[in-house]
Amino acid sequence: MLFKSGFLRFLADFRPRVDIDAIPEGELVFAREPMVRVTGPMLDCQLLETALLNIIGFQTLVATKTARVVQAAQGRPVAEFGLRRAQGPDGGVAVARASYVAGCASTSNVLAGRRYGIPVSGTHAHSWVLSFPTELEAFRAFAKSSPKNCTLLIDTYDVREGVEN
């Protein structure tokens, strides 16, 4: 056994006695500026350290990159579509949430939309295109089924041909 049973019982009953102070979410922060302060008994703080660094660090990274994209879009809406490439389903929800905080207008992640009130948007799947004899037929069928909100996924085969279709 890696850990002694007494320590595992301690962890099962552990309730951290810490205070956490942080800047408001979405606030601009510069390098080497403290974002979060955790105070309490050393053991309590150390047991929380890795989880806090993981959660805060990852979502801060995503929000920073997203804010740059939103700024480059110059007022045009930006949609988040990261679920297919995210590190696990919970990572996809975290990415959607952090992107929304950073200025994305919507997400393709239905669970994140439901959980956090983020507007949901999206396209058809690549499998939709693959289920038709040609890409153009798939696009026409999707446009007919979604005439008021049609966004086509153009990279199933070849992006240039997708744009032409």
PLM region spans:
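N-terminal functional module of multi-domain proteins
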Residues: 6-8
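Buried, small/hydrophobic-residue-enriched core segments of structured protein domains
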Residues: 11-17, 26-165
